Amino acid sequence: MTIDTSNEVKAIARYIRMSPLKVRRVLDQIRGRSYREALIILEFMPYRACDPILKVLRSAVANAEHNEGLDPATLVVSQAFADGGPTLKRFRPRAQGRAYQIRKPTCHITVAVAPSNKD
């Protein structure tokens, strides 16, 4: 099975309030899988990162179907990655006038799908 990357279609979710490290753990499981397999994996994994990834995957497939006229049954996850976004910085008051910084990470999730050529 080869992947035709000339017809690659992608979707991006930006500023997701989640650590990119935790999102990558899930993305590694669906990269290279068919759309059908990826859906099943994401539905049953117990991680919080699965919901936004599932949303981005469905958006990428909808883009492929609507914009390129591709059949969802032939689509494979060709690329899946999470880049770090801006970090929200907050402060927690501590004793004697001190304050500790709290970092709330965000990430940008990109999922690309492409049709597979079955040899």
Curated annotation (Swiss-Prot):
Keywords: Ribonucleoprotein, Ribosomal protein, RNA-binding, rRNA-binding. The keyword Nucleotide-binding does not apply. It comes from the Bacteria. InterPro entries: Ribosomal_uL22, Ribosomal_uL22_bac/chlpt-type, Ribosomal_uL22_bac/org-type, Ribosomal_uL22_CS, Ribosomal_uL22_sf. GO terms for biological process: translation. CDD domains: Ribosomal_L22. One of its GO terms (molecular function) is structural constituent of ribosome. GO terms for cellular component: cytosolic large ribosomal subunit. It holds the Pfam family Ribosomal_L22. Gene3D superfamilies: Ribosomal protein L22/L17. Part of the 50S ribosomal subunit. Belongs to the universal ribosomal protein uL22 family. This protein binds specifically to 23S rRNA; its binding is stimulated by other ribosomal proteins, e.g. L4, L17, and L20. It is important during the early stages of 50S assembly. It makes multiple contacts with different domains of the 23S rRNA in the assembled 50S subunit and ribosome. This is Large ribosomal subunit protein uL22. The lineage of its organism: Bacteria, Bacillati, Cyanobacteriota, Cyanophyceae, Oscillatoriophycideae.
